[in-house]
Amino acid sequence: MRRVGGVNRAHTMSFLDRFLIISVVLLASVFPVELFPNTGPVPRGGDGQFSGKQGQVVVVTVPELKEATSVKGKFLGRTVTLFPNPTAGGTGYIGLLGIDLQDEPGPHELTIDAQLGEQTRHFSYQVLVVKEKFAVEHLKLPKDKVDLDEKATARWKAEQEQVRKALAEESAMRLWQAGFIEPVHGKRTGIFGSVRIMNGQPRNPHNGEDIGAPMGTDVMASNDGVVRLVVDHIFSGRGIFVDHGLGLYSMYFHLSEALVNEGDLVKAGQVIGKVGATGRATGPHLHWGMKVNGARVNPYALLELPFPQNPAADRPVLAAPAVPAQEELAPTGVGGDGR
């Protein structure tokens, strides 16, 4: 079986195909749309049309804009940050578009503005957001973990505001490398996007992946970045937020111990914490989350994206561990940072 970047490709893509990982190439002249992996012709609408499921990540590439001084995008009010593509000889741009797990299904507009000297060129693309069939999980927890009193509710709201403010101050430059890695080896115990019914009460969908592992297991940074927050929150427990630049964040929750401080620079594969069961958790596991310009996306989607090496970095891309198979699921953790 052929392996790519340390990952069993057949094994990995069988899992990732659920999220239709795609790469959209927007050419400045004819505007064709291509998919990664290629799934056949795509209907056109506006300058072009493509579809993506809730929770997926899209690579947007704009080649051959030799005179462009900046290229910016917008999708559902969120920024689509594009930057010079090192593999295009300095003439192209590349960036990430995240589709949030709760984005409204249906057609939405992606706009791209390219500054060409004193002129701005406007491109418009139709993105069809496809509804994902997320699982439903019924969980039984201690009452005080679900029904918060007034004091606990005030704490939770303050913690949410702390995170909101911190994540609004993203690094203006790309810090991450071409290859993301899984932060801990273990079994998937909680599925991204699952609808959670806690003690009979509907709660927010699960915005990450839970990976079960023994207490104290090393937790690694998924990629290069700067530690933006180290917290101890009511639901997520001890947690670390890593800013990878240009609106891309990774989150690591329920840690027994955090081994980094706010402001620290970290490298992919660096141990930043230990698996624990702090916050709202039923057993030791890591809640691993990702956000792309505010969109909550499946973290496993980042493992196979066709991104070029960051020429500003000085380290080789580390091999990513294989993605766990579906049959390894075992409900041992709760995870999450919301109600």
Where are the model-predicted features located?
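Surface-exposed, glycine-biased beta-strand/turn segments
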Residues: 45-47, 124-236, 325-339
